[in-house]
């Protein structure tokens, strides 16, 4: 194998500048940069992924008459009330963690100080999703989880645009 060719391949692999001499010995040269640093740009808030989920959520809301169906079945099904209560508990704990603990009290790692808050929030949110699936199953059948997941992702991506 050719030594200059191997050095060139190594330089390209690790993005060394061509001026840097590659030595076989492990001598540290603090004044010489060892790799070219890439300038990282922050990701844009509105990208193809978030735009797709927001658009899909709008399309699902329009074509399946989501709010009309929700309004008609709200009082006739107790799964909505139970799911709504669980969703309220989940969002209350989440706002407590984000607004009160992180912003007001300044505890950035609240999951370390209060380790049970995140699993309780996750469990209540999943239980609320199951309740909403049971409540709307008689309307959309096996499409219900897909429609609710699309709505959920649209809301999450819309919230990510805000901040």
Curated annotation (Swiss-Prot):
Matching InterPro entries: TMEM128
UniProt keyword terms in alphabetical order: Membrane, Transmembrane, Transmembrane helix
GO cellular component labels: membrane
Membrane topology according to the record: Multi-pass membrane protein
Annotated transmembrane regions: 47-67, 79-99, 117-137, 142-162
The keyword Transmembrane helix is assigned to this record: yes
Subcellular location: Membrane
Record bears the keyword Ligase: no
Highest taxon in the source lineage: Eukaryota
The protein's name in its UniProt record: Transmembrane protein 128
Source species taxonomy: Eukaryota, Metazoa, Chordata, Craniata, Vertebrata
Designated gene of the protein: Tmem128
């Amino acid at each position: 194998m050719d030594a200059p060719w191997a050095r060139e391949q190594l330089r390209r692999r690790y993005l060394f500048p061509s001026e840097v001499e590659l030595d076989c010995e492990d001598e540290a040269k603090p004044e010489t940069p060892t790799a070219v640093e890439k300038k990282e740009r922050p990701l844009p808030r509105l990208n193809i992924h978030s735009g797709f989920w927001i658009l899909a959520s709008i399309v699902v809301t329009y074509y399946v008459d989501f709010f009309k169906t929700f309004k008609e079945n709200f009082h006739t099904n107790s799964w909505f009330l139970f799911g709504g209560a669980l969703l309220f508990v989940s969002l209350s704990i989440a706002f407590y963690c984000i607004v009160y603990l992180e912003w007001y009290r300044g505890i950035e790692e609240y999951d370390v100080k209060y380790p049970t808050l995140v699993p309780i929030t996750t469990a209540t949110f999943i239980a609320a999703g199951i309740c909403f699936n049971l409540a709307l199953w008689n309307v959309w059948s096996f499409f219900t989880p897909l429609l609710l997941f699309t709505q959920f992702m649209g809301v999450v991506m819309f919230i990510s645009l805000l901040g």
